[in-house]
Amino acid sequence: GTWKGEQGGAILSHSIHIHDLISMIFGPVSNVFAKLTTRVNNIEVEDCAALSIEMGNGALVTSSITLGAAEDVSRLKICFNNLTVESGGSPDKPYNPAEDEWKFLAREPITQNQVDEVLSSVELTKSWYAGMFDEIGKKLDGFNSDEVTLLDARESLEFVTAVYNSSRKGKNIYLPIGKDNPLYNSWLPD
């Protein structure tokens, strides 16, 4: 865990895909406030983080990250107006929540039967690289696709930049990140 080697810690390595998933669901990030620290491991980079994120659509997201838990888990809980969605947080699938057990819980006026009916019509898709290559294949064949684009990658890196910048400055950082951001070319500490 060095700045020279990995060039980032838990934000860059362990939680980046969860944050990408949040952006896929809610759209672009508007701003982030981050507290990062190293508390558990003898490394240079962060191993713990607490993030407060506001999405462009107004949704609020909190994210807590630690490399000090007894078990490696990725757990998501997403609360909509009439639906709560929870991943199982299985230690058997810490880096693949898509293949974990999920709960979709209705809240009035939506009924659980309505939710279950919608879920029964959803096709399972592949995850990891198999899923990525399926989406690229769809795009190449002229079909609608959820392939990851260069814009997605840029927005992900801008989010990481905003997180590191926020932690160092102690303030909210708004996205998108431009060339005027002091961390635009490097996240390495001074």
Predicted features by range, described:
Residues 12-15, 147-153:
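Conserved loop-to-helix N-cap of the C-terminal "lid" that shapes the substrate pocket in Rossmann-like
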Residues 18-19, 129-134, 160:
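A general structural signal for well-ordered alpha-helical segments in protein cores
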Residues 77-151, 173, 178-190:
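C-terminal glycine/acidic-rich active-site capping loop/insertion
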Residues 159-169:
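Short arginine-rich
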Residues 16, 64-72:
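Glycine-rich phosphate/pyrophosphate-binding beta-alpha loops
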Residues 51-58, 78-80:
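Active-site beta-strand termini and strand-to-loop segments that position acidic
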Residues 1-42, 170:
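Predominantly a Rossmann-like dinucleotide-binding segment in NAD(P)-dependent oxidoreductases
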Residues 44-48:
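A short, glycine/Asx- and small/polar-enriched loop/turn
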